[in-house]
């Protein structure tokens, strides 16, 4: 019913968006064990690195042809891998190093907004994986081409960690709160956004904070009543933060 509301209040299908941003700047210490030589985006699931899997899915399922990859930790190592993918894939990949990546993924995102030439784009984290059902829902959703959306699920699968999941609160058709410690919640952040660059014109000063998560950035949109949602199912997405999550991800991909 929530998803139906989105369709009724929107103006165009999602097939006009051809650009995506992948956040791949963090350390990923919980899954790498803090090993300094490890790079989370390069971790392989069934012979595909997390970053290559994200790129291929965006291209194959959403017809994305321009992808900005935001790097930070182990930038040089990741760049070597991405340069190889440039020769192998038909997608136009642009690698952007976020100088302030250690301040959080929110700071990394805000620092590269000026590089993104397209007004509306997808945003996702490299450690989130999605099945075909998820991408189908996104591609069929009707959206307003001037608004921002977050994919949310009203429930979680058994593979998710409830305590670690980011919760959201909804009032009518807008997200009114986001965070991991929300008591009265209506759903869960699936880690996939449809964003409009001009929406962030008034909040770029947030990057002056010592630490800034992506949820902090989205909280600013929420305060301005500018964050809407697209509903997906709880079993259509998974975030990979720990070694247990990595094991679950193998089962998740087998059950596509």
Residue ranges and their predicted role:
Residues 48-64, 80:
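A short, N-terminal amphipathic alpha-helix
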Residues 1-36:
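N-terminal nucleotide-binding beta1-loop-alpha1 segment
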Residues 219-232:
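Catalytic donor-sugar/metal-binding loop of nucleotide-sugar-dependent glycosyltransferases
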Residues 131-208:
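Conserved core of the sugar-phosphate nucleotidyltransferase
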Residues 119-129:
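Short beta-strand-to-loop acidic/aromatic patch adjacent to the donor-nucleotide binding site
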Residues 37-53:
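Short catalytic helix/loop segments, enriched in acidic residues and glycine
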Residues 77-121:
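Short phosphate-binding loop-to-helix
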Residues 206-216:
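Donor nucleotide-sugar recognition loop
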């Amino acid at each position: 019913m929530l998803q139906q509301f989105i369709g009724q209040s929107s103006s165009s299908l999602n097939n006009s968006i051809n650009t995506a941003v992948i956040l791949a700047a963090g350390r990923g210490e919980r899954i790498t064990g803090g090993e300094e030589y490890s790079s989370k985006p390069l971790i392989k699931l069934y012979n595909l690195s997390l970053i290559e899997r994200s790129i291929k899915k965006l291209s194959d399922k959403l017809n994305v042809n321009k992808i900005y990859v935001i790097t930070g930790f182990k930038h040089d190592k990741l760049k070597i891998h991405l340069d190889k993918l440039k020769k192998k894939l038909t997608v136009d990949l642009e690698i952007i190093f976020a100088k302030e990546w250690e301040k959080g993924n929110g700071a990394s995102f805000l620092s590269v907004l000026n590089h993104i030439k397209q007004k509306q784009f997808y945003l996702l984290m490299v450690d989130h994986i999605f099945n075909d059902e998820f991408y189908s829902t996104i591609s069929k959703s009707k959206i307003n081409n001037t608004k921002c959306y977050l994919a949310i699920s009203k429930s979680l699968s058994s593979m998710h960690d409830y305590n670690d999941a980011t919760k959201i609160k909804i009032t009518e058709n807008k997200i009114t709160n986001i965070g991991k410690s929300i008591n009265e919640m209506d759903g869960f952040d699936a880690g996939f956004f449809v964003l409009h660059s001009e929406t962030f014109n008034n909040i770029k000063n947030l990057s002056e904070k010592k630490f800034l998560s992506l949820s902090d950035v989205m909280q600013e949109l929420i305060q301005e009543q500018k964050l809407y949602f697209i509903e997906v199912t709880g079993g259509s997405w998974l975030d990979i933060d720990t070694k247990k999550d990595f094991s679950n991800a193998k089962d998740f991909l087998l059950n596509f």
